[in-house]
Amino acid sequence: MRHPLVMGNWKLNGSRHMVNELVANLRKELAGVAGCDVAIAPPEMYIDLAKRAAAGSHIMLGAQNVDLNLSGAFTGETSAEMLKDIGAQYIIIGHSERRTYHKESDELIAKKFAVLKEQGLTPVLCIGETEAENEAGKTEEVCARQIDAVLKTQGAAAFEGAVIAYEPVWAIGTGKSATPAQAQAVHKFIRDHIAKADAKIAEQVIIQYGGSVNASNAAELFAQPDIDGALVGGASLKADAFAVIVKAAEAAKQA
């Protein structure tokens, strides 16, 4: 049985005070939670501080992006080796905000995926369609293309131990969310698509849902058989709201 993962993407939010306070509150809220893995991805300069604040708890650390290169003259970038060195394990790649604002291509994201795997880190591969693509009935086509960028260059085995986050772009930060049935249909498609290459890997891969996940819709989303947790944005900045989502994932998968 797949173990759910709920991960908080803090995006461009944080301060030393906020990190210490939020992690301290998360430790209290999540004490006793064992049936769901939990990770947080603060801005890079706060990962080490968050790691120390979370020491001794089950909270794992992640990052919001990574560069292709391990070292060299690449101003402003952060390598997989650096993230590994400071204790980040779950690395988000391909987030729609990176695809949109930084023009990151499927091919570039697949290369980042490979670098992370080589370093023993866990890629959290974000995929998902825009509102226009959704309305044009291209959801499955887009998701397949984004997955195939990895499948066709690295094979299905690359997804062993990796995480996929399905985030319909039209639902990120908008307050809109796919219905549980809509989300489940896409998650099943993603799993079935990988299964064409390797059924065992497909059955094991964690597929999160992301896109305005909150305390009120989490339980119904997690009740779906192919939804294995969530990649949470805004709600991850509030310990009580994030904890409700984590506990909903734990309860749904133990039911």
From Swiss-Prot:
InterPro entries, A to Z: Aldolase_TIM, TIM_sf, TrioseP_Isoase_bac/euk, Triosephosphate_isomerase, Triosephosphate_isomerase_AS
Single Gene Ontology MF annotation: triose-phosphate isomerase activity
Pfam families: TIM (PF00121)
Cellular component per GO, a single term: cytosol
Location of the protein in the cell: Cytoplasm
Source superkingdom: Bacteria
Positions contributing to substrate binding: N9, W10, K11, G173, S212, G233, G234
Gene3D superfamilies on file: Aldolase class I
Biological pathway: Carbohydrate biosynthesis; gluconeogenesis; Carbohydrate degradation; glycolysis; D-glyceraldehyde 3-phosphate from glycerone phosphate: step 1/1
One GO term of the biological process aspect: glycolytic process
EC number: 5.3.1.1
Active site, renumbered: H95, E167
Annotated keywords: Cytoplasm, Gluconeogenesis, Glycolysis, Isomerase
Known catalytic reactions: D-glyceraldehyde 3-phosphate = dihydroxyacetone phosphate
Family matches, as NCBIfam families: tim
Subunit structure: Homodimer.
HAMAP family: TIM_B
Role noted for this protein: Involved in the gluconeogenesis. Catalyzes stereospecifically the conversion of dihydroxyacetone phosphate (DHAP) to D-glyceraldehyde-3-phosphate (G3P).
Family, as annotated: Belongs to the triosephosphate isomerase family.
Protein name: Triosephosphate isomerase
Encoding gene per record: tpiA
